Amino acid sequence: ACSGNGVIFDISDPYKPMRIDDVLDQKFAYWHSATFNNDGTKVLFTDEWGGGSRPRCRPSDPMDWGANAIYDIVDGKLEFRSYFKLPAPQSEQENCVAHNGSVVPVPGRDLFVQAWYQGGMSVIDFTDSANPTEIAYFDRGPVHEEKLILGGYWSTYWYDGKIYGTEIVRGLDVFELNVSDMMSENEIAAAAVADQGALFNPQQQFVVTWPKGDPSVALAFVDQLVRSEAMPQSDATEYAETVSAAAQELAENSKNRRVSNKLRSLASDLDTSDADAIAAMRMTELKTTLQDLARRIR
């Protein structure tokens, strides 16, 4: 994000970075930050309209001002997909605009936790980059009921299972995700085992990985497939029971060839031929995770 536009560079050779594409948007006032998804196939730009000091989330404000712009990266080029702005209108007394955030490492999903100054905090699902959705939020309300005092979340960052929100006036808030219709216990558990490296700097964005054959990762994929209606509940129950049996073997540091073979069989049953792109990706990742889990207990 370069204030007046968004630019993508090829940094394969860090000593000779090459500019390969750039985008302009007349609705963007100040291109403030850019965050890639973990696969590096998408980028989310934030527009800090007015430098973050003014109300820009009132009912009268356009939903594409002071918002995010989400682009897919296709053959090295940026292709616009959608805007996202927090859906809850704010008052004249609340400075509100898109600001700093970071990826929430749930496997199989592209999630971003974002600060909106006095607009609070949003967790955004942009797995479908053309249809981003808010799946969680927190909002303290205005610092003062009658006049605008600069405040709110400057940044919200995920680290080691928690979200840290730096509130300009009211200090540091620490959050955990709650189970909901849009976030399962298994997804939260899978995010907690993500490896972000020994040090975390959201501006560097090192690739996040998960332990091979981790039961919570497998169950997270199953939950996602059920939620998107790509897997019947009856099938999901069989997958969950088998993965849970494997998890018990791991907890007891034991082996079980029968459960291992069942995991391999379930992996081979996954058919992506009729699945959409997102479901197919999750099935493929689930298949790999089941095979890795099978090897761990064989």
Question: For the regions a protein language model found, what residue spans apply to each?
Answer:
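Feature marking well-ordered beta-strand scaffolds used for ligand recognition
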Residues: A1-L225
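Soluble extracellular-acting proteins and domains
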Residues: N186-R298
